């Protein structure tokens, strides 16, 4: 496997050093026991926020320059997506002011406001604009479908999604049989909406980059987890 690009390697190291990416034994919503856990809500310290905003911005710029992504507004779904989207917007303007100096951001409210400016959306109006959703991870895809529905209701056009981590993990089987092959939530969203979805890091990236940053036992357990639950897409 090729070495990680510098921004991915820097982000991975910051995530591990800052305790955002942890290794151990963690029960997920799916009831699977994962040897690693990533919590973007732990990027609350200024230096860690700098690390994640830089990684998001460089991932977005890379996708934009390759012609895979074009957008007008960065959208952060409430709640975790709000600081991620605003920080990414600011970092985009810092890294490339000529291209992104006037880029806008928006986010949604969980409950509509019935006074003042009212409505569900805070920030730039979405109508007729290409919207890039920025969030932490895609688990089952439910939250992203809700965000897409809100954007479309406001007249926006979803241009793509960028997340911090792609677990590359198959969805739980409806009958509970985890031995069956299956697609990932990210793959299902790509197929359902026909939009590009990007991740700063994938599970493959984590396994490649964690050597030397985590114990050999943690590397082995993470490799075993990938082999057991890796998606078919």
UniProtKB/Swiss-Prot annotation:
Residues annotated to bind orotate: 37-38, 139, 167
Catalytic activity: orotidine 5'-phosphate + diphosphate = orotate + 5-phospho-alpha-D-ribose 1-diphosphate
InterPro entries: OPRT, Or_phspho_trans_dom, PRibTrfase_dom, PRTase-like
Keyword Transferase: yes
Keyword vocabulary terms for this entry: Glycosyltransferase, Pyrimidine biosynthesis, Transferase
Metabolic or biological pathway: Pyrimidine metabolism; UMP biosynthesis via de novo pathway; UMP from orotate: step 1/2
EC number(s) stated in the UniProt entry for this protein: 2.4.2.10
One term of GO molecular function: orotate phosphoribosyltransferase activity
Entry GO CC: cytoplasm
Subunit and partners: Homodimer.
Function according to Swiss-Prot or TrEMBL: Catalyzes the transfer of a ribosyl phosphate group from 5-phosphoribose 1-diphosphate to orotate, leading to the formation of orotidine monophosphate (OMP).
Record-given protein name: Orotate phosphoribosyltransferase
Gene name tied to this protein: ura-5
């Amino acid at each position: 496997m090729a070495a990680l690009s510098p921004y991915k390697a820097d982000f991975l190291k910051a995530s591990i050093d800052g305790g955002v990416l942890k290794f151990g034994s963690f029960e997920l919503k799916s009831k699977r026991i994962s040897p690693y856990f990533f919590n973007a809500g732990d990027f609350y310290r200024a230096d860690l926020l700098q690390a994640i905003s830089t990684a998001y911005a460089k991932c977005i710029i890379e996708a934009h320059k390759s012609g895979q992504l074009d957008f007008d507004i960065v959208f952060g779904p409430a709640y975790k997506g709000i600081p991620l989207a605003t920080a990414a917007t600011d970092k985009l303007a810092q890294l490339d002011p000529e291209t992104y100096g006037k880029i806008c951001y928006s986010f949604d409210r969980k409950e509509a406001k019935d006074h003042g400016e009212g409505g569900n959306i805070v920030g730039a109006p979405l109508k007729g604009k290409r919207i890039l959703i920025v969030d932490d991870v895609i688990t089952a895809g439910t939250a992203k479908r809700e965000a897409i529905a809100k954007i479309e209701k406001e007249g926006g056009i979803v241009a793509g999604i960028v997340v911090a981590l792609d677990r590359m993990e198959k969805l739980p089987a409806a009958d509970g049989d985890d031995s069956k092959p299956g697609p990932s939530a990210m793959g299902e969203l790509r197929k359902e909406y026909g939009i590009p979805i990007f991740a700063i890091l994938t599970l493959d990236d984590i396994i490649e980059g964690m050597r030397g940053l985590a114990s050999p036992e943690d590397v082995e357990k993470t490799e075993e987890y990938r082999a057991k639950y890796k998606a078919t897409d």
